[in-house]
Amino acid sequence: MIVQDSVCSELMRGCEEILPVPELEKKLQKGIPLKIKAGFDPTAPDLHLGHTVLLNKLRQFQQFGHEVIFLIGDFTAMIGDPTGKNVTRMPLSQETVLENAKTYQHQVFKILDPDKTTVAFNSQWLNKFNAVDLIRLAATHTVARMLERDDFNKRYTTGQPIAIHEFLYPLLQGYDSVALKADVELGGTDQKFNLLMGRELQKHYGFEPQVVMMTPLIEGLDGVKKMSKSLDNYIGINETPEQIFGKIMSVSDELMWRYIDLLSFKTGKEIQQLKQSVLEGKNPRDVKIDFAKEIVARFHDQTQAELAHNNFIERFQKGNIPEDLEELSLVIVEPIALAQLLKQIDLTASTSESIRMVKQGAVKVDGDKISDPSLKLPIGKSYIIQVGKRRIAKLSIQQAD
């Protein structure tokens, strides 16, 4: 076991809040492997970079010799985490939860060392609960305590319904820490109430309470709202090397440093040296390129990272059209407006986005900037269509019989 002040500082780096810091330092000074727990409800099949902030911190604990428990909340996912919700979440089927859980395991081992990771499912102990067990667990806390939680309080004061089972969610998540005898639990800042519930329940059941370490919610590509698939401002870890590389290169320099701080495997000292080099004249674009290659290599490999970099240079810095660009075919009865066409071939998410991109001067057809979203491209021809810097398609428009 490595126990040094520098190690403690590195483990705490990037955390938004640690409760309480002295207890973490005391646990680390014991010089024995600690049980580090992080729970994930498999409510969606794919992870994005926002999820990996937590996974990166778990990886750090592994590197310093601690035992990491990757907890899949297959039982609690069927209830639905009410955190941040103003309506009751619809529960998922067991089949959906288990299918999502399989993909989670495949994805997380791109970051975590499988030989140093214990994968647990909370159904292993929660399925054994009977009515008496559940009532005893519910009796450990009051409704008043539950209403201290912001989202519950807002729903209560505005007359929005709160289902009884939603009060059970934080209790069941907290009980996971009892079952696993966790020393430390990691989670996002939005999980603070649930994480502290683990501490309270461990005390109730006679165990030493866990330390809670909260990581920040990372901003999406827009630099404003948190990274989310529903907001389409995310970088998925299962995306292609070109997509990951291109999306990272599209972010602002300010957001780049935020991503590097939370997502790079570089140490705090190495990152500080990078920042200093930029202050001394290094182009931040070069730092961004190196970071983009690091992330692509993590989820693919180094060769793919170099290829993605080369393709990016060819496509965007030199303005070249990739030779291997696949041609799409669109068969229509009569010409359609460009705004509708862009959505139909998935270059935009909606017609309104198409109109906005055209008005911003971000749409080109065969290299010419288009200003009219109602423009209709003639049938029987092929076109190179570009939206912004990263979206490009070769399209053949054909006449329907």
Curated annotation (Swiss-Prot):
Motif ('HIGH' region) on chain: 42-51
Reactions mediated catalytically: tRNA(Tyr) + L-tyrosine + ATP = L-tyrosyl-tRNA(Tyr) + AMP + diphosphate + H(+)
Main subcellular location: cytoplasm
Keyword annotations: Aminoacyl-tRNA synthetase, ATP-binding, Cytoplasm, Ligase, Nucleotide-binding, Protein biosynthesis, RNA-binding
Positions occupied by motif 'KMSKS' region: 226-230
Claim: Transit peptide is one of the keywords in the record: no
Protein's name according to its UniProt entry: Tyrosine--tRNA ligase
